[in-house]
Amino acid sequence: MRFTARERAGIVVGAVLGTDCALHLFWATTGSSWPATTEESLSRGLLNADFAFTPRVLYPLAAILLAATLMVLTRSGLFPWLAARVPGWLPTLVTIGVSAAVLIRAIAGIVWITGIDSSAATWFYRLNLLLYTPACLAMFAGCIAVLRSHCNQNA
């Protein structure tokens, strides 16, 4: 099967969002701090701060990530069955929201890379430099590709 550029961009963004959703569900259901050894080191590595990774926090985040995944894939033209069941503006609005969120995170990541409020000796700094910020920039580009391409949506 050949995918259009819009569909490929949606698949990439959806894969990242879906993987993030799966990780949140894993942490919520198992209580594991994988891939870190402790919840504190997980929080520090992911967020550069101490936050509790409790089901009360993780389940709502997983639900938001799942909804975002479905809407981006729908806006990409990959889920026509879902496009027929939601207002046509909803996948577009959610994709705009995802693009804004990842752009803001990418800008924050660039600030942290400069050393503002982040130490180069931490795992967070290295992960932010090599993974988080590049992934957010790629997701932003993917969202723009999804949004720029014409996609028939049911109104």
Q: What are these regions, as identified by a protein language model?
A:
Residues 10-29:
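N-terminal signal-anchor transmembrane alpha helix
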